[in-house]
Amino acid sequence: MDTTTLISRLEAASSSFHNLERQLADPDVAADPQRLETIARERSRLEPLVLDYTSLQKVEAEQVQAKSLLKESRGDAAMEELAQQELQELDRHHADLIQRITLALLPKDPRDERSVMLEIRAGAGGDEACLWAGDLARMYERFSSRRGWSVTPVSANEADLGGYKELILSVKGDAVFSELKFEAGVHRVQRVPSTESQGRVHTSTATVAVMPEADPVEVQIDPRDLDISTARSGGAGGQNVNKVETAVDLMHKPTGIRVFCTQERSQMQNRERALEILRAKLYERQLAEANASERSARRSQVGTGDRSEKIRTYNAKDNRMTDHRLGRNFSLDPVLEGQMDDVIDACIAEEQRGKLADLSEQAD
């Protein structure tokens, strides 16, 4: 990004920031909680960038002074050395600020701020694949807890020996998609199953889909396209188990997408959940089509984002997790405990490098 464009964007961000601060002082805004929250969130997003811009201006002024001092110190070896050291330090600080600001100004995915529907399906490997799907679910629940996100199961098809044939989790919080989007794809595990008496290593897979939540305005569903039926929900016991038809089985006829929702206590709640899942699945389809048409022109995407892409191998024997998109290994045990920060940070850094490469090509 050239200097003129950089400064222009910083000036625009600074102007927006100060305008938002004026709005926050407006009594009419204070009387509208929803508007107040929206403005406060946008102000918080811009604040680090504006502070860095202020620091950049200060450093550039100090660089001018340091260069002047260096020029005046010619002939005085001690003073010249001190001035040179100060200028070098200021140059390093300036370069760091430019790098940080450039990354902050890179194009943002508008979906990054959204909550997600996280779908985990057992793949190849039979019962062990179902257990592996359960392990992945726990990994994401622990990671989400560390982030302060809320996780709610919205649809679950449990396996007889444990784990899940299919599980859909609603993960709600700030910028969930910005981090979990890198999890979409096939996760392969190599380990000795607990049911294996000969100690042989088995390979199993589970598929993860990460669907940003879509609102009814973005994905409109014609009621005539739906087949909706009800069924009795199973449970752990009690008077209402299998007596009241609270489960909802929803079929979207144009796409053949089926959603079966049993987790809520009432039929109405399960119907709303099923529609929420369907909207997310339809939205994911739209995004996949858009990504496919754009992918050849972009370097910024980490992997394809497709649920069929083999993204990771988890090797229990060597306590190693390999991310094939990054070509890097990570310690397995911490990752399975939800300590995924290093992995996610590496994916974000790779995405940023790609965006910088895209910008450089556009500049050329």
UniProtKB/Swiss-Prot annotation:
Residues 289-315 are annotated as: Disordered. Residues 306-315 have a biased composition (Basic and acidic residues). GO terms for cellular component: cytoplasm. The modification N5-methylglutamine is found at residue 239. InterPro entries: PCRF, Pep_chain_release_fac_I, Pep_chain_release_fac_I_sf, Prokaryotic/Mito_RF, RF-1. SUPFAM superfamilies: Release factor (SSF75620). Signal peptide: none annotated. It holds the Pfam family PCRF. It comes from the Bacteria. Methylated by PrmC. Methylation increases the termination efficiency of RF1. PROSITE patterns: RF_PROK_I. Keywords: Cytoplasm, Methylation, Protein biosynthesis. Its main location: cytoplasm. It is found in: Cytoplasm. GO terms for molecular function: translation release factor activity, codon specific. Peptide chain release factor 1 directs the termination of translation in response to the peptide chain termination codons UAG and UAA. NCBIfam families: prfA (TIGR00019), PRK00591.1 (NF001859). Belongs to the prokaryotic/mitochondrial release factor family. This is Peptide chain release factor 1.
